[in-house]
Each structure stands twice: as structure tokens, then as C-alpha cells.
Regions:
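Membrane-interface junctions at transmembrane-helix termini in multi-pass inner-membrane proteins
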Residues: 119-149
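Alpha-helical transmembrane segments of polytopic membrane transporters and translocases
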Residues: 19, 23-46, 78-79
Length: 183
């Protein structure tokens, strides 16, 4: 979705709202170079966990061990949330100071964008684990269909949030969260 977000965001804010290219680039930079970088770290842990769970899920699925599958799913979700929730909460609450420390950016806008970190980290961690579980039980087409549907919904929501509600860069952040929720 990020591949499409930048041109959609850029065309709408510069074309419709007459925002300068410099301002647009600054706002997109906050989103892509700070917000996305910091939220991707805990999501990467969930991604590595999901990679590790697939072989065990396949083994339980082939053996028709329902209890084993349920235990593995439960453990993966618990461990993922054990990492995602505190990381997301920390980024959400301490986003301003973290950005000041790492990037020298103490702006209020950056701190406000970081408030959304909790939701982003949790929903993307859950969707990553869920997709791995579906792959482990031989339901490969479901994540693909869900991603396609989520992308369409994401683009519609992003456009509405930008054009109707004029949420600027926050529309991209909220659109990103809705993508993770619907996957």
C-alpha cells in the first residue's frame, strides 16, 4: 500500500489543497523516514515469529493434531502481543522523545503521528501472525484475497480521509492502520 500512498497523497495535497511540494515532502518524510521506520521494528519481530511457526503448524496440520495446532496458534499470538503491545505503547507514549533522540526532531506533529504507533504495531503484528497461520494450514489463497480487498479498502479510505476530512498526513497513517485491520 505504501507504493500507492505516496503518489495519491502527493497528488491530492499538492493538487487539490495547494500545499507546496516542500511541505508535502517534509510531511511524507516524517511518515516514511520516522514513523514507518520505528513501527517496522516490532513488526519485524512478529514477522520472524510467523516464519518460525509455519513448519510447526504444517507438522501439526499434517498429523491432524488439532490440540497441537491450537497450542501453537495461542503461543504465537501471545508471544507476538507480548512484544507488539509494549513496543507499540512505548512508541505511542514516548514517540516525541524517541524522535528527538534518534532524529533530532522534537516537533509536535511528529509526536502526534507517533500516537498511532500502538494501533499500527498491534494490527500489523496480528495480521502477520494470522497470515502465517493460514499458510501453515494450507489456506494460501485467503491471505492473498484479504490483501487485495484490504488494498482496495485502504485506497478508498485514504482518499476519503484526504479529500473529505482533510486529515493530511494523518490520513495516510489511519489508512495504514485500516489496511492492517482488514488484512
Amino acid at each position: 500500500s505504501n507504493l500507492l500512498d505516496n503518489p495519491i497523497y502527493g497528488n491530492i495535497v499538492t493538487g487539490i489543497f495547494d500545499v507546496s511540494s516542500k511541505t508535502r515532502a517534509e510531511l511524507w518524510g516524517v511518515y516514511s523516514a520516522k514513523y514507518r521506520v520505528l513501527t517496522t521494528m516490532p513488526i519485524a519481530i512478529a514477522s520472524s515469529l510467523s516464519t518460525a511457526i509455519v513448519p510447526a503448524m504444517v507438522r501439526s496440520y499434517i498429523a491432524k493434531d488439532k490440540q497441537g495446532m491450537e497450542n501453537k496458534v495461542s503461543l504465537a499470538l501471545k508471544f507476538s502481543m507480548l512484544i507488539a503491545f509494549p513496543c507499540g505503547m512505548g512508541l505511542s507514549v514516548l514517540g516525541g522523545p524517541i524522535n528527538q533522540l534518534l532524529f533530532g526532531d522534537g516537533s509536535k506533529r511528529t509526536a502526534t503521528i507517533m500516537i498511532f504507533s500502538l494501533l499500527t504495531v498491534v494490527v500489523f503484528s496480528l495480521s502477520t501472525i494470522s497470515n502465517a497461520i493460514l499458510q501453515g494450514i494450507d489456506k494460501l489463497n485467503i491471505p492473498i484475497k484479504n490483501s487485495a480487498i484490504s488494498l482496495v479498502l485502504h485506497l478508498i479510505i485514504l482518499s476519503v480521509l484526504l479529500i473529505v476530512f482533510r486529515l493530511d498526513i494523518y490520513a495516510v497513517v489511519i489508512g495504514d492502520i485500516t489496511f492492517g485491520l482488514t488484512v
